[in-house]
Amino acid sequence: MGCYHFHLNQLSRGKGQSAIDAVCINQIGNHIFEMVNAVAEKKQRRALDLYYELLALKEPPMRILFLLVRQYRILFHVQSLQVKGYGRKEIAEKAGLHPFAAGKYMEQTRYFKMEELRAVLEESAELEERVKTGRLTDTLAVELFLVKYSS
């Protein structure tokens, strides 16, 4: 169910804006997590479809990029803790994650090498700089990011 339909349904039931926002934000977070999965699994079409769905929900491309990069930072942190021999519980504590989420991130890290995650983070900083200096549109920057890392 899209945020729009949920919004109308909740308004008719007298629910507050905060409940609506919480579900919409959760939906966006789920899309971002799924997008990272699609990129990791080299499912380019799926990654782009999720991106276009977020754009249809009026999510700004730079916010999408920010959320993607946040996920990759978490993956980098989780993987660095795994390399040091920490288990799920310790990773959850050190990374400030719920143990379930830590487990999900640990599953995602199997698709990446540390060098790849580092490269993703460096590339995202370069893309952001190119957008801010007007050398690249924000929409295209996210598309390039998704295409590059899902091929």
How would you name each of these model-derived features?
Residues 1-15:
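Amphipathic alpha-helical "lid/sensor" segments that cap RecA-like P-loop NTPase cores
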Residues 4, 43, 50, 120-123:
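Amphipathic, well-ordered alpha-helical segments in soluble domains
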Residues 12-116:
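Small-residue-rich helix-loop
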